[in-house]
Amino acid sequence: MIKIGNIELSSNIILAPMSGVTDLEFRRLVKRFGAGLVVSEMVASRAMIVESRQSLKKSAIMRDDATSACVQLAGCEPNVIAEAAKMNEGMGAKIIDLNFGCPAKKVVGGYSGSALMKDEQLAAKIFEATVEAVKLPVTVKMRMGWDDNTKNAPTLAKIAESSGVQMITVHGRTRCQFYSGNADWDFIRSVKESVKIPVIANGDITNFAKAKEALQKSGADGIMVGRGAYGKPWLISQIDHYLKTGEEKSAPSIAEQLDIVTEHYEAILDYYGESVGVPIARKHIGWYSSGLPNSAEFRGAVNLMNDPLAVKEKIAEFYTSVMETNKLKEF
């Protein structure tokens, strides 16, 4: 199993940090399905140190995951990131992850995220300041580089390792690719071969076969699942079972999915409150139902609803209708 500093993960499959997705309740759910590590949404370090309400929500720690709670920080000022890391350590985080991979224009425009890959000297200062500030393991998530002409992830990985960083995750695209094309898992092997600390492969890992291929091509110690987990918090459990046994584990039954969706929906309402929670839940409900019969009509109806009870009843009605449709197909 992967060791990050003195923390040993229960699985080599990790849930990626995703803005607007990996909030406390989604992380808790995916962790229950067997993820070795679940990473918070990206938290802006400067917002963190002024304790903005949004940043505190994003970095909230699962008290039932006290051994490996991981918070991802973004920013470009070494002292500010270090201070934010210390704050999160004080609030119970066990791992600090640094964001060197976000391709969003708003983020790179502030010289954060993947823009940091263009300045190796600044990157080194950020690594060193963060490692020195906390007693926790520090990790980093990066891309291959800024563009095809500057794929410097192996070099940056060496800098990170020499600065005391304990694990590196590489998304197999450049910043300029955003999410176009295919993730280059072969390139990640060059990062793995450049350092001795664990390296995690990320990008396009959406099913059993891709998980296995990503590990084989990259030689990585583990994989990080991102968008593939949209509406499928059980995917990590399926992949883990497949990699260990070679058997393709079925997704939960429709009845079981109804229970999962309902539980997640209620957890969102409890965490955010009904007025905020209902709009937040819509995207998750849409992802859960994608590919099921009449899902487009269902999503359209839910997106117009604001009453929490009405949404819950609609969820039950939809999944019940899917179960009935499936029964008819069996005859």
Curated annotation (Swiss-Prot):
InterPro entries: Aldolase_TIM, DUS-like_FMN-bd, DUS_fam, DusB-like, tRNA-dHydroUridine_Synthase_C, tRNA_hU_synthase_CS
Positions of FMN binding: P17, M18, S19, Q72, K141, N202, G203, D204, G226, R227
UniProt name for this protein: Probable tRNA-dihydrouridine synthase
Gene Ontology molecular-function annotations: flavin adenine dinucleotide binding; tRNA binding; tRNA dihydrouridine synthase activity
Summary of the function given for this chain in its UniProt record: Catalyzes the synthesis of 5,6-dihydrouridine (D), a modified base found in the D-loop of most tRNAs, via the reduction of the C5-C6 double bond in target uridines.
Chain ranges passing through the membrane: none
Family under the similarity heading: Belongs to the Dus family.
Top-level taxonomic group: Bacteria
Cofactor: FMN
PANTHER family documented for this protein: TRNA-DIHYDROURIDINE(47) SYNTHASE [NAD(P)(+)]-LIKE
Active site feature: C102
EC code(s) of this entry: 1.3.1.-
Provenance organism: Rickettsia conorii (strain ATCC VR-613 / Malish 7)
Gene3D superfamilies reported in the protein's UniProt record: Aldolase class I, Putative flavin oxidoreducatase, domain 2
SUPFAM superfamilies found in the cross-reference section: FMN-linked oxidoreductases
Reactions catalysed according to its record: a 5,6-dihydrouridine in tRNA + NAD(+) = a uridine in tRNA + NADH + H(+); a 5,6-dihydrouridine in tRNA + NADP(+) = a uridine in tRNA + NADPH + H(+)
Keywords, ordered alphabetically: Flavoprotein, FMN, NADP, Oxidoreductase, RNA-binding, tRNA processing, tRNA-binding
The UniProt record lists the keyword Cell membrane: no
Lineage: Bacteria, Pseudomonadati, Pseudomonadota, Alphaproteobacteria, Rickettsiales
